[in-house]
């Protein structure tokens, strides 16, 4: 169930072991969050170091044997893709280099045009099509079929003609993504008031509810990969913020700060790792009983506006829906970005205290001129906000993806609350991911490939019924 990277990898693996495979896909095209991503995947090389690094990232929330299995299997990711005909390029290393053994982490992606994720997805889709694996599109799964012994023997889907039942002669693999677009689950498990999302709107927690109904335990429900983003009426998904990334290639684009909804600056903007940005914005004020940083505002000047798009419009669900202007002027005309000739007037436009915002910008500018920032921002990035006009855009903690879902073991078997495998049920991908409190860039796609192969292999080896 699910036709993204995890589902496609599992299907390819099972097919190549002579299993008969049918895939159910909720949308018309498939791709899920894979196609909306930047396409990087982990492929560990120093295995012992990678195990230590990922164990530290998990903070004890993922058993050691599962991490070891992930590392060993993910070390085959490049080899496996190359064996299918893909061309691979290096992408980088650890996204949290301050954590132990970070040098062991390497990331790669499939070479090609597009955002990286689409390239990987198109390659895997072609492999599925090449094998003539049946894919039932626009057929969301509704429930798992369980016999009186507790074994999963099929799945019920629904298409335009009504409900259909698919008998599983060996097993069912759930690879249907997370709950980025399910408000009920987000309110139950995630902190803060609002988490918008960048990826596939079809990710509404279907696999979580279906697996719970047949007795699955769940884990990592409060774990996410969450950068900053901007949300506008008329778009189901948010746009990924780009300022911190843009700054690296243009020093003039450093003239920006983050302020809360009262106008106070609260963080070194460049110290935040992209996937962990959300954690700085879900602070709850126990005196005012509110989340003062939801929304926050990015304040910047004309030099930043001229430096390029302030969003990453080549990834996320909006990438084929809207093309952001290169100089941000169209979005200013839409009032998505507010502008004013002075900071005080800008504060009035966005409805925050002009004294606080003015002081925040003045204090930041003093630090720039003295090369000594109050929040410790690197002196090389201290460019004063002083070239009018001035701009503001609201920003929220957003989701690349959630990590929670049915708990699984090192063999990709989905477990009940007592740690016992539910017969005939496997999981792969971000649904019940192994990632816990801290996330490594490319870790989910690395997991889609690694546990997709594990799930496909083990499901194919199940005794037929």
Model-derived regions: residue spans:
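Glycine-rich loop(s) and the adjacent beta-strand/alpha-helix scaffold that form part
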Residues: 159-163, 167-236, 445, 451-454, ...
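Short, well-ordered coil/turn residues at beta-beta hairpins
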Residues: 1-2, 158, 168-169, 174-176, ...
């Amino acid at each position: 169930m699910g036709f993204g990277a995890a589902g496609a990898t599992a299907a390819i693996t099972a097919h190549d072991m002579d299993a008969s495979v049918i895939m159910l896909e909720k949308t018309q095209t498939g791709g899920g969050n894979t196609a909306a991503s930047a396409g990087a995947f982990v492929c560990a090389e120093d295995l012992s170091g990678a195990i230590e690094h990922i164990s530290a990232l998990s903070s004890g929330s993922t058993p050691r044997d599962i991490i070891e299995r992930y590392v060993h299997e993910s070390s085959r990711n490049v080899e496996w893709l190359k064996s299918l005909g893909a061309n691979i390029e290096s992408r980088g290393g650890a996204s949290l280099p301050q954590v132990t053994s970070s040098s062991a982490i390497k990331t790669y992606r499939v070479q090609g045009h597009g955002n990286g994720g689409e390239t990987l997805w198109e390659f895997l889709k072609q492999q599925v099509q090449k094998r003539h694996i049946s894919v039932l599109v626009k057929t969301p799964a509704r429930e798992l079929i369980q016999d009186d012994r507790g074994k999963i023997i099929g799945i019920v889907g629904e298409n335009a003609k009504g409900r259909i039942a698919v008998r599983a002669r060996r097993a069912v693999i759930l690879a249907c993504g997370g709950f980025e677009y399910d408000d009920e689950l987000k309110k139950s498990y995630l902190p803060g008031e609002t988490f918008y999302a960048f990826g596939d709107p079809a990710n509404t927690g279907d696999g979580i509810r279906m697996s719970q109904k047949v007795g699955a335990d769940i884990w990592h429900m409060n774990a996410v990969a969450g950068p900053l983003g901007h949300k506008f009426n008329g778009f189901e998904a948010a746009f990924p913020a780009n300022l911190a990334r843009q700054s690296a290639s243009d020093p003039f684009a450093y003239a920006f700060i983050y302020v809360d909804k009262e106008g106070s600056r609260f963080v070194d903007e460049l110290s935040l790792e992209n996937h962990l940005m959300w954690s700085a914005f879900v602070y709850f004020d126990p005196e005012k009983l509110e989340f003062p940083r939801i929304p926050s505002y990015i304040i910047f000047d004309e030099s930043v506006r001229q430096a390029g798009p302030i969003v990453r419009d080549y990834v996320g669900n909006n990438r084929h829906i809207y093309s952001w202007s290169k100089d941000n002027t169209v979005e200013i005309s839409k009032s998505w970005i507010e502008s004013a000739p002075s900071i005080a007037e800008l504060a009035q436009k966005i409805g925050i205290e002009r004294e606080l915002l003015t002081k925040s910008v003045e204090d930041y500018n003093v630090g720039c001129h003295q090369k000594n920032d109050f929040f410790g921002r690197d002196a090389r990035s201290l460019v004063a906000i002083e070239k009018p006009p001035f701009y503001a855009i609201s920003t929220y903690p957003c989701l690349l993806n959630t990590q929670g879902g049915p708990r699984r073991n090192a063999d990709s078997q989905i477990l009940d609350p007592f740690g016992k495998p539910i017969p005939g049920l496997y999981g792969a991908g971000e649904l019940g991911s192994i990632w816990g409190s801290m996330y490594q860039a490319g870790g989910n796609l690395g997991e889609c490939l690694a546990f997709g192969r594990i799930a496909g292999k083990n499901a194919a080896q199940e005794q037929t019924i």
